[in-house]
From Swiss-Prot:
This is Prs ADP-ribosylating antitoxin. It comes from the Bacteria. It comes from Sphingobium sp. (strain YBL2). Belongs to the MbcA/ParS/Xre antitoxin family. Pfam families: Xre-like-HTH, Xre_MbcA_ParS_C.
Amino acid sequence: MSELETGARKAQGKGTPPFAYKALYRASPVDRIGVIKKGVAASDLKRFIAALHVDQKVMFDALNLKTATVNKKAANNQPLSTEDSERVLGLAKLVGQLEDMVEESGETDGFDAPEWLSSWLRQPLPALGGVNPIDLLDTMEGQAVVSRALAQIQSGAFA
């Protein structure tokens, strides 16, 4: 649990990821629920979106987050609501899943999981009927569908 909460906070420099993505992916559901209930810091969300190399507004819309609320909470050093935190951690968990997949392949040199995932999320996926995976991130069920699609890439079911 401590790695989930402090894994990326040890050195919060500009290039430091806001989450320990792989630890988050590998953590037990009970551990992730604990982090969700504490709430994700709005400032960590902003750093996470920066790591994804995507416009903040695009990702806020994808996660069904209100820009004004996130900005206010970030300015006041407050956490997001439980519901918002769950969707944010779900997306961070997808980055961890991707990191785990790439590590299993043995080709990790120079691979930027957040950036790759961000690009993949914004491309129509035939296996999803041509839907962009980013359009499914606003619900946990949608995130589960995206997770399965990501896993199927690794298994070779589709690309």
